[in-house]
Regions:
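Metal-dependent nuclease catalytic core centered on acidic motifs
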Residues: 83, 119-155
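Charged, low-complexity intrinsically disordered tails and linkers
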Residues: 1-56
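Acidic active-site catalytic centers that drive phospho-/nucleotidyl reactions
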Residues: 74, 102, 115
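A short acidic/basic microdomain associated with nuclease active sites
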Residues: 82-106
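Acidic-basic catalytic patches of nuclease active cores, encompassing PD-(D/E)XK
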Residues: 54-89
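Active-site beta-strand-loop-beta-strand hairpin of nuclease catalytic cores
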Residues: 105-115
Length: 155
């Protein structure tokens, strides 16, 4: 699959409806600025490893915000690391757990695991898979920017 979005003629220029999920809006809206967004997302998607495209596409198209935004964030982070010159392995196996982080990124002698997390709130509660913090094991380095918390650990 080389596209996330449907190959359709778009004529609806109306803004997003209050009840409309993000993907449905992006897929239907017919304005030039949103066409550029679709083209950019599809370009990133074409560079994503083919073996993992079906899963990512399904989650990106999901009406559940946690799935949609999680897939969007994974695609963005994957593209970022690739453009920074890193090799990116998707869902690498770990020796100490059956869980798999989103990526193992490496360049030269530098390697790190990356887990992409999107926290959404609805009426004061965290939504999404598990509803809590995910941990891959001891992480001695923690960076809290106030917006994003990053835990760094050598791979």
């Amino acid at each position: 699959m080389s596209t996330i979005f449907d190959d359709i003629e778009r004529r609806d220029r109306s803004p997003a409806l209050h009840t409309e999920d993000s993907f449905s809006f992006l897929n239907r809206v017919a304005t030039p600025e949103w066409q550029r967004v679709r083209e950019l997302v599809d370009a990133w998607y074409r560079d994503y490893p083919e073996a993992s495209q079906t899963d990512l596409r399904g989650r990106f198209r999901d009406s559940d915000a946690a799935q949609h935004y999680g897939a969007w964030w994974e695609l963005y982070v994957y593209t970022l690391f690739r453009r920074l010159g890193y090799d990116v392995a998707i869902h690498p196996a770990l020796l100490t757990t059956t869980r798999q982080p989103d990526f193992l990124v490496s360049r030269g002698e530098t390697a790190m695991y990356v887990e992409c997390v999107v926290a959404l709130t609805r009426m004061g509660t965290i939504s999404g898979d598990g509803g809590g913090e995910r941990s891959w094991g001891p992480c001695p380095h923690v960076v809290d920017t106030g917006f994003v918390v990053m835990r760094l650990r050598a791979a």
